[in-house]
């Protein structure tokens, strides 16, 4: 049974995995107060997906609630079309309206890509009411290095994904490429996988590889997460 991570829990998981490659190879255990006996098997099972996951979109939190619509193909480098936020963003795009849903591999070892995508759509449809609506809300999918999808839903709706079959983590998403407001993985527009222009794809690969070697600033991230929680 999967458990949706709270903001504070997500930040602690992020602190564990936002480390150098050596730290990923020999990770320290999660704090015991975050893992109950009931949920520890699920969390440790999901942990196996995180190193690959962070190559696309790392587990991050941010303190603002941005509005506006998201279109990775139409968005440019200008952030002025986004409304004012509560505080300066730590991770652009992490607005608690875009969520990364990490899943177990759907359909078994021999599942085809389209079968996996259908499973993602069906999973979200259980929450939003129909597969047609689910296709509109999913903005990216991953069927290779990790399994899951990104969807644009509010925080209350994201909580309803907790415990659905196959769901491991429900995490706030953030941009891999802030210049183009791009969350990474494969773009999913109007129910179909859409390729990026070649130059955008090359840029995405470079950013993805770079992110694997970046050393995060844990203390600033955790301090601002706590600040956000104190404001609630």
Curated annotation (Swiss-Prot):
Main localization of the protein described in the UniProt heading: mitochondrion
Alphabetical keyword list: Mitochondrion, mRNA processing, Transit peptide
Coiled-coil positions: none
Transferase as UniProt keyword: no
Region (Disordered): 208-232
Any one annotated GO CC term: mitochondrion
Any one GO molecular function term: protein homodimerization activity
Matching InterPro entries: MORF/ORRM1/DAG-like, MORF/ORRM1/DAG-like_MORF, S8pro/Inhibitor_I9_sf
S-S bonds: none
Subcellular compartments: Mitochondrion
Range of the transit peptide: 1-67
Pfam families: MORF_dom
One record GO biological process: cytidine to uridine editing
Top-level taxonomic group: Eukaryota
Compositional bias (Basic and acidic residues): 212-232
Gene3D superfamilies referenced in this protein's UniProt entry, alphabetically: Peptidase S8 propeptide/proteinase inhibitor I9
Keyword match tRNA-binding: no
Chain segments annotated as transmembrane: none
Function: Involved in organellar RNA editing. Required for the processing of few RNA editing sites in mitochondria.
Entry similarity comment: Belongs to the MORF family.
Subunit structure and binding partners: Heterodimers with MORF8/RIP1, MORF3/RIP3, MORF6/RIP6, MORF7/RIP7 and MORF9/RIP9.
Protein name: Multiple organellar RNA editing factor 6, mitochondrial
Natural source organism: Arabidopsis thaliana
